[in-house]
């Protein structure tokens, strides 16, 4: 339970007059949003955030003042966990949170701009942005999910991110850190913090934590545990929260059945961290568990769409760890599987990670390689022994599958572009009716 001030403090701030610069920034952001929507260029939230920050560089801090905020970060699972945390916190009051996963400054500012009176916030934040966003919003809780290679040409060395997070956490000693003790890099980032809630959230991908981030010596694993051979004190902490295939377990003997609307063991770990964060903010544990179970489609992830004679479920994966987890969610009994890979800047143009993903799991399933980098994917599938065809356009790839259920697994821009194409197709069908 938090001992910080309740939301009453923020309520009193709602009547506080904002500086002129901030008021002008908010008005300009609203105008930018309207213009973006009026011209059909999008929802306008991002451009609104960019405009507001340009006019008032302090606007994030000013809009977050008085809010009790939880930040959620990590390489994978940020959007889903943020949605779960917001749902679990909702019993406490209105929660400001991103609807679209926009996790850098402009998206965060846009969210705070649109929900100024909310006394709570659950903010998804890109790993590299956590230190300065924390300085601006002074989070009550920081959730650290996992750390692994993301985009090799964007981030470079994952240990650098761990060090920056560790340094950022040190600047906020009153923040409660909800950390995944199964992840070596996350544990290192949180290890020195005075207030840590350890969660056994799982770590199916361990390829980026074979050596100790603090000493460089090997990490030795045994069962669920791990330890550094270079520092006898640096080892897997004892978790206060954990889960199994049916239940969630917490402090003081708490346990409850946990049934989720999203697939995969990784999401059970995400849900456990979301519950731990909400309880740290003051939520009732049983109500928090029930709330995370209501979260289904998240920014298009896990959504099911009817396209002609195909029922299409979409999954997003952005890096080796995410791909490996997403592959385990694929329904092997589906009538078709489309894997779409692009190599644009937001995806990371270095696709060498394809060789780290175990596509051998689809030796018995008909796969369609798609996306701008379908040829690269095709080579990887060939070496994996996965029977496949190559259809670069994802919509055409779906159409090439037998009628019935089709699983689509795509990286970031391929997922985004497919979503736009499916919306366009849906509008066209409505126009024909």
Question: What are the language-model segments listed below?
Answer:
Residues 75, 99-100, 123-126, 146-147, ...:
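Fold-independent oxyanion-binding glycine-rich loops
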Residues 145, 178, 270, 274, ...:
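Residue-level signal for inorganic ion chemistry
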Residues 112, 158-159, 208-219, 399-407:
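Short, surface-exposed amphipathic charged segments that create phosphate/polyanion-binding patches used
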Residues 58-87, 259-261, 277-279, 289, ...:
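A short, flexible N-terminal coil/short beta segment enriched in small residues
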Residues 3-9, 13, 17-198, 205, ...:
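Phosphate-binding loop of NTP-binding sites
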Residues 3-6, 10-13, 17, 195-321:
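Adenine nucleotide phosphate-binding catalytic loops in nucleotide-utilizing enzymes
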Residues 1-45, 65, 279-284, 290-433:
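ATP-dependent carboxylate-amine ligase
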Residues 85, 89, 108-112, 271-281, ...:
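Buried hydrophobic packing segments
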């Amino acid at each position: 339970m938090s001992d910080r001030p309740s939301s009453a403090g923020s309520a009193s701030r709602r009547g506080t007059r904002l500086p002129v610069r901030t008021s002008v920034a908010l008005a300009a952001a609203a105008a930018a949003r309207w213009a973006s929507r009026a011209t059909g260029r999008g929802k306008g939230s991002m451009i609104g955030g960019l405009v507001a920050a340009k006019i008032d560089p302090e606007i994030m801090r000013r809009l977050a003042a008085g809010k009790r905020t939880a930040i959620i970060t990590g390489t994978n699972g940020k959007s889903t966990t943020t949605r779960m945390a917001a749902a679990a916190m909702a019993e406490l009051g209105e929660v400001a949170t991103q609807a679209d996963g926009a996790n850098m400054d402009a998206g965060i500012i846009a969210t705070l701009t649109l929900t100024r009176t909310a006394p709570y916030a659950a903010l998804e934040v890109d790993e590299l942005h956590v230190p300065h966003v924390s300085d601006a919003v002074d989070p009550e809780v920081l959730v650290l999910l996992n750390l692994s290679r993301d985009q090799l040409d964007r981030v470079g060395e994952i240990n650098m991110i761990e060090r920056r997070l560790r340094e950022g956490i040190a600047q906020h000693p009153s923040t409660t850190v909800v950390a995944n003790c199964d992840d070596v890099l996350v544990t290192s980032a949180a290890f020195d913090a005075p207030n840590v809630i350890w969660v056994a959230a799982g770590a199916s991908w361990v390829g980026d934590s074979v050596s100790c981030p603090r000493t460089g010596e090997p990490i030795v694993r045994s069962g669920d545990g791990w330890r550094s051979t270079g520092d006898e004190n640096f080892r897997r902490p004892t978790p206060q929260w954990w889960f199994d295939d049916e239940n969630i377990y917490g402090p003081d003997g708490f346990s409850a059945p946990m049934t989720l609307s999203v697939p995969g063991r990784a999401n059970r770990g995400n849900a456990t961290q979301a519950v731990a964060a909400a309880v740290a903010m003051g939520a009732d544990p049983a109500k928090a568990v029930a709330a995370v179970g209501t979260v289904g489609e998240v920014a298009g992830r896990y959504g099911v769409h009817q396209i002609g004679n195909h029922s299409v479920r979409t999954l997003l994966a952005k890096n080796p760890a995410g791909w490996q987890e997403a592959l385990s969610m694929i329904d092997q009994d589906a009538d078709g599987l489309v894997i779409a890979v692009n190599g644009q800047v937001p995806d990371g143009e270095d696709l060498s990670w394809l060789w780290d993903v175990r596509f051998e799991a689809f030796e018995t399933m008909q796969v369609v390689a798609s996306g701008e980098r379908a040829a690269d994917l095709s080579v990887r599938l060939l070496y994996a022994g996965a029977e496949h065809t190559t259809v670069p356009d994802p919509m055409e790839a779906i159409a090439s599958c037998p009628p019935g259920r089709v699983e689509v697994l795509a990286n970031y821009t391929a997922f985004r572009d497919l979503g736009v194409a499916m919306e366009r197709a849906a509008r066209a069908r409505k126009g024909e009716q």
